[in-house]
Amino acid sequence: KITALLDSIEPKGECNFVQDFAQQLPIYTLSEILGIPEADRQKLVTWMEFLELAQYIQVEQMKKELDAEHTKEPVNTEMIDMFNNMIDEMFEYGRDILNSKRKNPQDDLLSAIANAEIDGQQLSQEFLDGSWLLIIFAGNDTTRNTLSGAIKLLTENPDQRQKLIDNPDLMPNFVQECIRMISPVMHMRRTTTCETQVGDQLMGPGEKIVMWYGAANRDPSVFTNPDKFDIERENAEKHL
């Protein structure tokens, strides 16, 4: 697949790397592992892009609702309806294909999930829904973002690009340094269930906690000159 993608790009002379490569490769790989029919793979692209935009759509919608409270104007629910319809479509497809894999298992990940058992019981629909959502969302954007970010880093740092060309053995460390610099996952959020103390910070129950990967991955107490892209960095793999 990599060769095919590169062959399709070469005659163009230039390309949109995100659209022509970084987006295509993870979808193909994920679909092959899951057992998604080729005809349905574009649906995954649409759902993933929509899920990524959904959080921003929700924020804008909340702003409009707050404004409407002051202006007494009716709230436009078109965006909310579109979001709900897209979510329903995504979960309906997931349930259908998992049900199909349960009846006719194949050598793929969805078949394994659909037919897995805990204490002799098949997984609940709620568990299957959660697995489906996690797989199609988390299995794509991190790889796409890392591929795109790596090309950007190499473009901005020609000296590091030349080092990699001259010494391909640096590739594993190059990948680790790219992940550190890019931090393809922005943050992880949690909600406290009871009073909790982390370091000097006391948090009450129900408080929101956010861990920013990018901040940790550029911690100067861990990484010397943390904003520098260095494919020979000795502790590049210490990223989160």
Report each predicted region and the residues it spans.
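Cytochrome P450
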Residues: 1-240
